Regions:
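Extended charged/polar low-complexity repeat regions
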Residues: 1-476
Length: 476
């Protein structure tokens, strides 16, 4: 790139993976090994696993069809990515791959494992149509299923713990209906990559519209109240140069030959300006009130500033690691804060002046599990299999916990021995809040998910009214 950083791809010179990329060296000097496997290797591995497990091997062909509807297929798949060299941590490399992939006997992606070895994603495919995904799951979350029509288009998205959707396709419009019987219609124009949604009928009957130019760039948007906003893209770059609001007021935007914003003028006539160096780094920014902020750089191979100076002359300095991580920050008074990071880039310590430090620990999945200060006071954190924070244990041993529903929404929180609970509808909206003393607050929404009524624990009801564009116009 323009800073002299190079990403290098290493290809096998011979053998069954000849010509394939099996290694990458990034601009910071880290080397990653890409572990490839053939269909025959995966089939043999499946047979060996079955034998060691004392089960009957399942059908796993040694070869795949050379051509599919998606194109040529040589059967080679990426199975793992390893970090094999790190200039900053040469003696502390991960003992396991950063990510692993599992494949079906037909060569479809089946599972993804993170650096801790835990499964984080899984996929299921149609028995008849190779590569057609019919189910998908994040670990700890419900499985979402899909159904298709004869043309391979999704007609149903089935969500066992939330909203499900059906899709009906016509020549120039698509009708989407959710399990609450709310309907939206998307009207389209154009073909292939230039197809655009030009009109949307919302569930409440309101309509919004958009217009595009011949190459698919947005030119106008008309809201549900019939008010139109105009956009003027640059003929060559497509960058927006002017926005005119429904009341006729305009904002203008100007760019340099690198497509970087150099100035912007709002409807009120106020302007911001930006200047860049020959490498495209921001070196000066002028605010609408005329205040100037300057940015300094001491490394020609980095786009990160080493210092900033504001309109008052106050100066702040920063140092960075080769991986772009903040190592130290010195404020305008000379107060220095230093930061430590682990090999995964996560912050492990913050050191402030006067010997005050804070230390952070993470589990094998990269989740924060403990924060300890200089005096040894430690706060610990626990998570469920989906990665939701379930407990915070304070230094005195007190425990605050949270329970979640299948989709990761908090349904119960306990703090200081007091419990508060939440109930949701199928759309994921809070409909009932029960406080620590057992009193209730209920909520109602319109078909566009806008809050329209709130009844408090004292029985008093507050109603909210919105205009066609969704703006709150009255409460009573």
């Amino acid at each position: 790139d323009r800073f002299g950083r190079t990403q290098t791809f290493h290809r096998e010179a011979a053998g069954e993976f000849s010509g394939e990329i099996t290694g990458v060296t990034d601009g910071a000097g880290r080397h990653f090994r890409l572990v490839l496997t053939t269909q025959a290797q995966r089939a043999e591995e499946a047979r060996q696993q079955a034998i060691s497990g004392g089960t009957e091997p399942s059908a796993f062909p040694d070869t795949l069809p050379g051509y599919t509807e998606y194109g040529r297929d040589n059967g080679i798949r990426l199975s793992a990515v390893w970090l094999t060299h790190d200039p900053e941590y040469p003696e502390n490399l991960p003992a396991a791959p950063l990510v692993r992939y599992g494949w079906t006997p037909r060569g479809e992606l089946a599972v993804v494992y993170d650096r801790s070895g835990k499964q984080v994603r899984s996929f299921t495919y149609d028995d008849k149509y190779r590569g057609r995904m019919v189910a998908h799951r994040h670990t700890g979350r419900p499985e979402i299923r899909y159904r298709y029509d004869s043309d391979g288009r999704v007609t149903e998205q089935l969500n066992p713990a939330g909203l499900s959707y059906t899709y009906q396709y016509e020549k120039d419009h698509i009708t989407i209906t959710d399990s609450l019987d709310r309907r939206e219609v998307l009207h389209t124009q154009g073909e292939a990559g230039l197809k655009r949604v030009v009109k949307k009928e919302h569930a409440d009957g309101s309509v919004t519209q958009s217009q595009f130019d011949a190459v698919g760039r947005l030119r106008t948007q008309t809201d549900a109240a019939g008010r139109t906003t105009e956009y003027s893209p640059d003929v060559v770059t497509g960058l927006i140069t002017r926005i005119t609001t429904p009341d006729g007021r305009a904002s203008a935007f100007y760019y340099n030959h690198h497509s970087q914003l150099t100035s912007a003028t709002g409807p009120d006539g106020l302007e911001i300006r930006r200047e860049y160096d020959e490498l495209g780094r921001l070196i000066q920014e002028t605010a609408p009130d005329g205040d100037i902020t300057r940015y300094r750089y001491d490394n020609p191979h980095s786009d990160l500033p080493c210092a900033t100076e504001d309109a008052t002359g106050s100066r702040k300095t920063m140092t960075w690691s080769r991986y772009g991580q903040l190592l130290s920050f010195t404020d305008c008074s000379g107060y220095v804060t230093r930061y430590d990071h682990d090999r995964f880039g996560q912050m492990t310590a913050v050191h402030r002046e006067e010997g005050l430090s804070q230390y952070r620990a993470y589990d094998s999945r990269g989740q924060l599990i403990a924060v300890k200060d200089t005096q040894g006071h430690e706060t610990r954190y626990e998570y469920n299999i989906a990665g939701d924070l379930t407990a915070v244990i304070a230094p005195d041993g007190s425990r605050n916990g949270t329970q979640y529903d299948a989709w990761g929404k908090a349904i119960c929180t306990t703090q200081g021995g007091l419990t508060r609970s939440m109930e949701y509808d199928a759309a994921g909206r809070v409909i009932r809040l029960t406080s620590e003393n057992g009193s209730h607050t209920t909520f109602r929404y319109d078909v566009l998910d806008r809050l329209i009524q709130e009844t408090g624990f004292d029985g008093r009801t507050q109603r909210y009214h919105h205009d066609l564009t969704g703006k709150l116009i009255r409460s009573e």
